[in-house]
Curated annotation (Swiss-Prot):
Residues 29-42 have a biased composition (Low complexity). Keywords: Cell inner membrane, Cell membrane, Chaperone, Membrane, Protein transport, Transmembrane, Transmembrane helix, Transport. It is a multi-pass membrane protein. HAMAP family: YidC_type1 (MF_01810). Gene3D superfamilies: 2.70.98.90. Belongs to the OXA1/ALB3/YidC family. Type 1 subfamily. The chain crosses the membrane at residues 6-26, 350-370, 424-444, 458-478, 499-519. Coiled coil: none annotated. CDD domains: 5TM_YidC_Alb3, EcYidC-like_peri. Residues 28-56 are annotated as: Disordered. It comes from the Bacteria. It comes from Salmonella heidelberg (strain SL476). This is Membrane protein insertase YidC. Interacts with the Sec translocase complex via SecD. Specifically interacts with transmembrane segments of nascent integral membrane proteins during membrane integration.
Length: 548
């Protein structure tokens, strides 16, 4: 029995350590804050390019759909601001969440265009193109399902380049179509590129982190190829000039933060070069450059790419590009978190409340694990029955640890007791607990998701710490109801304070996770009583007062 309790303590400490370690691995170390200056520099060739120099400001046009509110600069056609009207900046706020931003304090842009030998975005061909637009404000009207925003540029040779943003109702994926009309007598060689650039340091208005470890998630770059489905690239790695330079057919590049992402997905059959670059001034970039395309004289060439700018909605992202849904970063336990989330989402489709969905999924998980739980308690009961024999054996053999171990194993074999039989439910519960943590911290559906009463956001900590206290109370009751053979005063004190210690740990955990643990403890109490009644009938348990 002592070993079972020690294993429980070790298991809980292990869970806490793994969460802390995951945070340490994923969080980006923040260097000393430095002032970020505005720039329109782009590394639109490869990781080694020095970038397109700044060339003056264009006009700012606005595009509004039912889910996006973008600002596009006619100089280059870059998306310099993106607001998400469906997602408030903070709980209870009327201000929309801002994903892309261009201010003196912070840069986060989605850049794109045509480079290559004859591309207007090639630095060797002069300033970036200044596109013409028919109006400065575009709005997706009621009843309209698609909105096109065409931008045109004609170079000195009379070649016309058209860049058209295509928006669809309810969609965070924006197609960017290019048309190149060759008015000259020689072929034009152009390549599409897409680049995401961002300031490494977060200003106060962008920093949604916290001083506690339970609320930090990965912020950085990522890419995908047919060979590497999902690879993260930290901002500080790019800032240290440890740059990516990969050629691939298909795939995507992205920048990630908790719940939201931007990504460029090239749409071509050729090879793309994926790169990262340190652009200076505290700004880093990840992007792609497509294989060159030749447009013959008198002909028109067409190319396209897709920009994702919005929340990390798994099913929608998966429909846009293979493995794009993996940007919902569930950590190393993704293979558990993903099925859990699918089950949770299915339950939510019936009950309509994420908190009640968590309660139901807890009952389902614990119900599936009931045979193992019963085996655990049976093993623990048999171990208690053997304690007098084990104690007598220890007294008889004294300090001969080797003989103690040999005779103890022989005793277990004779009595058909597995000393580790009570560990399996604990081993199974640990990854489930961690997977649920990742799921709560990574699923946009649970952001600002209310439960009941004072719990208005299941992804955030309980503002009044009521749930952690209730968790500690349930843990205390489980401890008091469980038989023990602990006689060492120090171990007794440690076990007595375990509910208090873990209540403190859980103060900063997401309330949805604490809710899961409370319900799991309540299920444990119920199952405990049912199992004890069964064990009483077999003579393996008695209702005598628990030792303290």
């Amino acid at each position: 029995m002592d070993s079972q309790r020690n294993l429980l303590v070790i298991a809980l400490l292990f869970v806490s350590f793994m969460i802390w370690q995951a945070w340490e691995q994923d969080k980006n170390p923040q260097p000393q804050t430095q002032q970020t200056t505005q720039t329109t520099t782009t590394a639109a060739g490869s990781a080694a390019d020095q970038g397109v120099p700044a060339s003056g400001q264009g006009k700012m046009i606005t595009v509004k759909t039912d889910v996006l509110d973008l600002t596009i600069n006619t100089r280059g056609g870059d998306v310099e601001q993106a607001l998400l009207p469906a997602y408030p900046k903070e709980l209870g706020s009327n201000e929309p969440f801002q994903l892309l931003e261009t201010t003196p304090q912070f840069i986060y842009q989605a850049q794109s265009g045509l480079t290559g030998r004859d591309g207007p975005d090639n630095p060797a061909n002069g300033p970036r193109p200044l596109y013409n637009v028919e109006k400065e404000a575009f709005v997706l009207a009621d009843g309209q399902n698609e909105l096109q925003v065409p931008m045109t540029y004609t170079d000195a040779a009379g070649n016309t380049f058209t860049k058209t943003f295509v928006f669809k109702r309810g969609d965070y994926a924006v197609n960017v179509n290019y048309s190149v009309q060759n008015a000259g007598e020689k072929p034009l060689e152009v390549s599409t590129f897409g680049q995401l650039k961002q300031s490494v340091n977060l200003p106060p208005h962008r920093d949604t982190g916290s001083s506690n470890f339970a609320l930090h998630t990965f912020r950085g770059a990522a890419y995908s190829t047919p060979d590497e489905k999902y690879e993260k690239y930290k901002f500080d790695t790019i800032a240290d000039n440890e740059n990516l330079n990969v050629s691939s057919k298909g795939g995507w590049v992205a920048m990630l933060q908790q719940y939201f992402a931007t990504a460029w997905i090239p749409r071509n059959d050729g090879t793309n070069n994926f790169y990262t670059a340190n652009l200076g001034n505290g700004i880093v970039a990840i992007g792609y450059k497509a294989q060159p395309v030749l447009v013959q004289p008198g002909q028109t060439g067409a190319m396209t790419s897709t920009l994702w700018v919005g929340p990390e909605i798994q099913d929608k992202m998966a429909a846009v590009a293979p493995h794009l849904d993996l940007t919902v970063d569930y950590g190393w336990l993704w293979f558990i978190s993903q099925p859990l989330f699918k089950l949770l989402k299915w339950i939510h489709s019936f009950v309509g409340n994420w908190g009640f969905s968590i309660i139901i999924i807890t009952f389902i998980v614990r119900g599936i694990m009931y045979p193992l739980t019963k085996a655990q308690y049976t093993s623990m009961a048999k171990m208690r029955m053997l304690q007098p024999k084990i104690q007598a054996m220890r007294e008889r053999l004294g300090d001969d640890k080797q003989r103690q171990s040999q005779e103890m194993m022989a005793l277990y074999k004779a009595e058909k007791v597995n000393p580790l039989g009570g560990c399996f439910p604990l081993i199974i519960q640990m990854p489930i607990f961690l997977a649920l943590y990742y799921m709560l911290m990574g699923s946009i559906e649970l952001r600002h998701a209310p439960f009941a009463l004072w719990i208005h956001d299941l992804s955030a900590q309980d503002p009044y710490y009521i749930l952690p206290i209730l968790m500690g109370v349930t843990m205390f009751f489980i401890q008091k109801m469980s038989p023990t053979t602990v006689t060492d005063p120090m171990q007794q004190k440690i076990m007595t304070f375990m509910p208090v210690i873990f209540t403190v740990f859980f103060l900063w955990f997401p309330s949805g996770l604490v809710l899961y643990y409370i319900v799991s403890n309540l299920v444990t109490i119920i199952q405990q009583q049912l199992i004890y009644r069964s064990l009483e009938k077999r003579g393996l348990h008695s209702r005598e007062k628990k030792k303290s």
